[in-house]
A protein has these predicted regions:
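A conserved acidic beta->alpha catalytic loop
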Residues: 27, 39-49, 62, 86
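Conserved donor nucleotide-binding strand/loop of the catalytic core
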Residues: 48-72, 76
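Short aromatic/hydrophobic "clamp" motif used to bind/position activated sugar donors
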Residues: 82
Length: 364
């Protein structure tokens, strides 16, 4: 066992990232030993900004393939381990300190390190939506990226699961770039893997092409192949699509279909609650919101939302009970939600409402 410390190359691919790249690099430049930036066609000040941090800037002709660009970036790294980030990712102060500690203590037998990825944060700085990615890998293993879009890094060997969180702070609006890559691949006669089909459906939904997304999700779910976690997630997103189309029964059926793959998840129970709530079926909604708080947290899932198991369903139960005229219960669940997110604006709004309803305060 060797814990004498490691050296790290940071690899990033960029294109028109002038708004975020400095923020990203500021958080890691004093930790990593090398910064490698691959530019895929920036026309803004991205490269000018990057030059202040590293001389290792390489141009790569964009070929609608994120894996190709990432593999090129990895090929330019020279240190023992490679850390990868996107330009709109950041390491908060606690994560910076944790990475410094990991760098000094990591067992050199470790081939890959996974880290939590906080994709969406609430007003209290807590993650609303999380996943986990392999972020730090041993260079000599020559691990490769696969997939034109929503690429993944294939790793093997000795794995270490760390608690160093990478935080995503997206600045750009949703575009149809990824959707077009899938569409072009299909037009060129390329066969999509189940994973590609899953992400093609996600991109279609993100671009509000709900009918297209429904067909893609249904096709994916009807295949025997495919990871069960992606199947569970696809059921929920299919439910979202049907809800957007006003097909309420199909929306519930789609979410409930996820139960065939594992015990009910808080994310899909909360979804079903929203579907009934939108139809003003408040008792049914309360049932599903309550269930969301009782099922076990799927913390090992790459697609989990901690809020869907606690304050989010409690807050919706507050609204449902209020609609049913049960203000005592409504107040109770508002305060229960507040125990998780005390500074939430919706909770404060509800408190003002209840002050107008009650002559006295209630405690949880």
């Amino acid at each position: 066992m060797n814990k004498q410390g490691i050296t790290i190359s940071l690899c990033i691919i960029v294109r028109d990232e002038e708004k975020t790249i400095a923020r990203c690099l500021d958080g890691v430049e004093e930790i990593v030993d090398e910064i490698v930036v691959v530019d895929t066609g920036s026309v803004d000040r991205t490269k000018e900004i990057v030059e202040k941090y590293t001389p290792n800037i390489y141009d790569f002709q964009w070929i609608d393939d994120f894996s190709a660009a990432r593999n090129f970036a990895f090929s330019k790294a020279t240190q023992q381990y490679i850390l990868w980030l996107d330009a709109d990712d950041v390491l908060l102060e606690d994560a910076q300190e944790a990475l410094k500690q990991l760098k000094g203590q990591l067992d050199s037998n470790v081939d890959a390190v996974s880290m939590p990825y906080h994709l969406v944060m609430d007003s209290n700085g807590k993650p609303l939506y999380c996943t986990r990615r392999y972020r730090l890998v041993k260079r000599e293993k020559q691990f490769q990226w696969f997939g034109k879009v929503h690429e993944y890094l294939a790793v093997s060997g000795e794995i270490f699961n760390s608690n160093i969180a990478i935080t995503h702070k997206k600045e750009k609006e949703v575009t149809d770039r990824n959707l077009k890559i899938f569409q072009n691949a299909v037009a060129a006669g390329e066969e999509l893997s189940p994973r590609d089909l899953f992400y093609y459906a996600n991109e279609s939904m993100d671009n509000q092409k709900y009918n297209d997304a429904v067909l893609l999700y249904e096709t994916f779910l009807n295949q025997d192949e495919g990871w069960y976690e992606e199947k569970i997630y696809a059921c929920g997103k299919l439910g979202d699509c049907y809800a957007k189309l006003g097909l309420w029964e199909k929306a519930v059926e789609a979410c409930a279909k996820s139960f065939r793959y594992d015990v009910p998840r808080g994310e899909n129970c909360t979804r079903i609650g929203y579907i009934y709530m939108d139809q003003q079926k408040y008792n049914e909604a309360i049932f599903w919101f309550k269930l969301a708080t009782e099922v076990p947290l799927a913390k090992d899932s790459p697609f989990h939302s901690p809020a869907s198991y606690t304050w989010l369903p409690y807050l919706q139960m507050c609204i449902c009970y209020s609609k049913l005229g049960e203000q005592d219960k409504a107040y109770y669940y508002n305060e229960l939600a507040a125990s998780y997110v005390p500074n939430n604006a919706a909770i404060e709004y509800n408190r003002k409402y209840f002050r107008g309803v009650f002559d006295k305060q209630y405690k949880v």
